[in-house]
Every structure is written in C-alpha cells, then in structure tokens.
C-alpha cells in the first residue's frame, strides 16, 4: 500500500462552465496531502480511466469532473481506480468521509501538513487518440485507412470533438459536415445525449445533407455513443446494442451479451437467432450490466459485452470500460472494411426487426415513501397479471430482473411493457413496444390498474 505522497491521481473535465473551478478545488485538496496531480484538462471519461492503464502515466486513480448529459448547471465527479469505476458502495463511503469533515478541519490539515504535491500537465487525450488511431490502422490497414470515407461527428459541444479532429481526420477520413465539435458548456445546439430525439434528428440530417458514409454522436463526456448509417437510419437504443454485439459475434460465438431491462423481443431474436449469441436482459444502470457481465465471467460463463440501450457499451477486451469512442472506433473499422468490399453498414443490421411503435411514459409517485410504495405497486401488478391477465392475453415474462415485464398477445395488440422503479426519482417509468396494434392499447391497461394508487 502506497503512502499519500507516493500517489499519482489524474484529474480531467468535460466542457461544463464550472469545470475549471472544480478542478482547481480538487487539485488543492489532493496536493494538500502530498499527492501528485496530473492535470488532463478537457478530457473524456474513458480517457481518464485509461490514464491508469497507459504506461507513460500509470496513475493510481482518476477523477473526471462531469455530469454527463444533465443540465448545464449540474456537475459532479466520477472516480476510477486501476480496477475501473467505483461502485455506489465506494461512493457512499466517500460521501460519509466528506460529511464528517468540517471546513475548519480541512483548512487546519492543509496548514499543518504543508505537504504540497506537484501538479503536472498531462497529454492523456493525445495518448488516447493515438491509441484509437492505432486500433484502426491495425484492423483496416495502411497509413490512411479511412481515405475515401466521409464520417460526420456530432460532439454536442461536449468533450468529443477530438474524435473527428484527432482520430478520424489524421487517418484520411473526410469529416465534412461534422458539427458542434467546439466545447461549450452552455450546450447551445442540442442536448449532448444519443437518446435525445432532437440530437438524433440533428446527426441524421447532417449525414443525409453531406452524403456521409457514417454519422457518430457522443454524449458530453464520451462514455456513450450512437451512430447513423448512410441511409439516415438511427443506430441507437436496440440497434446500437445489436451493432455492438454483431461486431464481436464471429470472434466470440455463443458469448452472453448482458443488457439493460428495456430491450425489445426483436433484439433478443436477432442476438440469439441471427448472431448465435446468448442474451441476458438484466437491469437499468450501466454499472449493473457491467458488474453482471463480470460476475458471469467469474462463474465460468463467457460474457464479452455489457451494454445499455442508452449507449453505454463495455467490452471485456477493453477492461469492461463503457467507452463511447471505443465503440465508435469499432463501428468505423467495420464501415471501412465494408466500404472496401463495396457494401455499407446497413448490411450488418438488415435482419434486425424494429417494433411498429415504442414509447416511454413516466408516472409520478405522490408519496414520501416512494421507494417502498413503488415496490408495493409492482408486487400488486404482478399479482393482478397472474390472477386476471389471461382474460386479456397478458402474461408475466420470466426470468425478469427488474420491475414487472408483461407480454400482450390478443386480437388487438401484440407487444410488451415493463413497469419499473426509477433508479433515482419518485417515478415509475413504463416502456411499451408493439408489433401489432398500438402502444396506447397497453398503456390503457396500465392506466386502469394504476387508477387505484397514488400516482399521476
């Protein structure tokens, strides 16, 4: 175990307005303990973890200052050790320690120790970009492996602009039409979020208008990404899961893909029947799916991919790090390989069926004890389906690891819904997909059931 003075911690941030002041405060705190601080400046979250991996840095830990896609007035910290991102139990312990310290105590410690650690500027993003470039060169071949490809990048004014400028362009890609590459914490163009409707419409337009072979879009801190093919088809939600899995299917036949709970039945059919993989539909929360995949591997079950429909994709080959730029790089490689063969990215997902309609509705729980009350509602719903569901062609899905998932199959509608508790808010999100009829047919059933409860 190292002493504090032997530790080296990297600190980076996204484009948020409060980033610099928070970085300064973090640096003062670390240096007061004698810790060496590597100032990485504008960074992506995955690059900060990689500062613990790259030999030229080998940091003992990393702190990323970001609030992902949340509103511009929010900010926060993501913590990494060499083993990966800290879990909620670790975060709870950090908060407990912080709550036990007063400002006076901290100032006294600072003066007493007088052990200022060094601050060093670190080009982690440059090293990280080089790492991604080498990955493309190795798998596509040549010094300009992307020559002849037009790839549009939408960074949403977050930290992802480097991908167009420092990864794609130096390898010969035409990045004409790329947009919002400049970091701007006001996020003036659209929410930097691959799940956001306006954001996806924006990158789709850019691909079509610029006749691009591929479009890529990142969230603020680049731990998530989605794509658009040359036809303007969105590759997000279920489709980004399918794409991420298809990219490794030949190398890892039969591997288990762990996803969050709101994936479609059509995705399961694609993964299992078209790709020959196994699908474990687990829980929302990217740490949940990553930890489940790690657990499977520890128990002798091969799992090469943990991914959320939000665009968090973590490959075993990449330290189970949810890395939007790494996923984007694998998609770029596949696009380049297909281009050489005279094909486009659309062939990869040609067998993936899309639902006729998909919606999400969120119910507010109007109770102070919303967590317990929400669980009671879910238990009652499960009992109701078991008791009366057969009358309307409704049946419980099993196994199921989060909320209550119900299949509907009757004359009017064929589809499914999932009612679950929100990870953080007093809400009950309802996800609905149908291949026949309308989502409103299923929503009506859930609305009628919830009428007896204190929700709105």
Kindly give the residue locations of the regions a language model identified.
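N-terminal small/polar loop signature for handling phosphorylated ligands or for N-terminal nucleophile
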Residues: 2-74, 166-228
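Short glycine-rich phosphate-binding loop at a beta-alpha junction
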Residues: 4-14, 150-152, 255-261, 304
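Short glycine-centered, acidic/aromatic-flanked micro-motifs in structured strand/loop junctions
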Residues: 11-13, 81, 153-155, 229, ...
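Proline/glycine-rich low-complexity loops and linkers
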Residues: 40-45, 95-130, 229-309, 313-315
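Phosphate-binding and adjacent anionic-ligand microenvironments
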Residues: 252-431, 436-456
């Amino acid at each position: 175990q190292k002493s504090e003075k032997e530790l080296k911690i990297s600190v980076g941030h996204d484009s948020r307005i409060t980033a610099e002041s928070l970085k300064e405060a973090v640096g003062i705190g670390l240096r007061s303990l004698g810790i060496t601080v590597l100032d990485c400046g504008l960074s992506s979250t995955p690059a900060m973890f990689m500062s613990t991996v790259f030999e030229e840095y080998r940091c003992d830990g990393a702190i990323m200052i970001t609030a992902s896609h949340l509103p511009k007035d929010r900010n926060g910290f993501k913590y990494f050790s060499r083993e990966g991102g800290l879990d909620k139990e670790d975060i709870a312990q950090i908060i407990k320690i912080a709550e036990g310290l007063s400002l006076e105590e901290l100032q006294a410690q600072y003066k007493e120790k007088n052990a200022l650690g060094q601050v060093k500027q670190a080009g982690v993003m440059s090293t990280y970009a080089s790492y991604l470039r080498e990955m493309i060169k190795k798998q596509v071949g040549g010094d300009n492996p992307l020559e002849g490809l037009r790839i549009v990048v939408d960074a949403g004014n977050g930290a992802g602009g480097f991908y167009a400028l420092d990864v794609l362009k130096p390898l010969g890609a035409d990045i004409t039409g790329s947009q919002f590459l400049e970091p701007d914490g006001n996020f003036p163009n659209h929410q930097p979020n691959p799940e956001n409707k306006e954001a996806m419409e924006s990158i789709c337009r850019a691909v079509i208008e610029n006749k691009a072979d591929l479009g890529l879009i990142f969230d603020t801190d680049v731990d998530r990404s989605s794509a658009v093919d040359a036809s303007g088809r969105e590759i997000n939600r279920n489709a980004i899961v399918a794409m991420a899995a298809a990219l490794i299917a030949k190398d890892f036949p039969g591997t288990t893909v762990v996803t969050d709970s709101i994936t479609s039945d059509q995705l399961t059919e694609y993964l299992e029947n078209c790709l020959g993989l196994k699908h474990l539909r687990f829980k929302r929360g990217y740490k949940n799916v990553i930890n489940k995949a790690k657990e499977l591997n520890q128990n002798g079950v091969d799992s090469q991919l943990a991914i959320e429909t939000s665009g968090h994709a973590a490959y075993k080959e990449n330290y189970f790090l949810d890395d939007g730029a790494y996923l984007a790089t694998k998609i770029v490689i596949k696009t380049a390989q297909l281009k050489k063969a005279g094909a486009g990215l659309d062939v990869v997902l040609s067998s993936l069926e899309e639902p006729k309609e998909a919606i999400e509705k969120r119910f507010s729980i109007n109770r102070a004890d919303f967590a317990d009350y929400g669980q009671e509602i879910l238990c009652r719903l499960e009992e109701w389906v078991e008791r009366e569901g057969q009358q309307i062609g409704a049946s419980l899905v099993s196994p199921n690891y989060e909320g209550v998932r119900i299949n509907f199959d009757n004359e009017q509608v064929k589809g499914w819904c999932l009612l679950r508790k929100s990870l953080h808010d007093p809400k009950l999100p309802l996800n609905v997909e149908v291949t026949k009829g309308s989502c409103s047919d299923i929503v009506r059933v859930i609305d009628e059931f919830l009428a007896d409860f204190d929700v709105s």
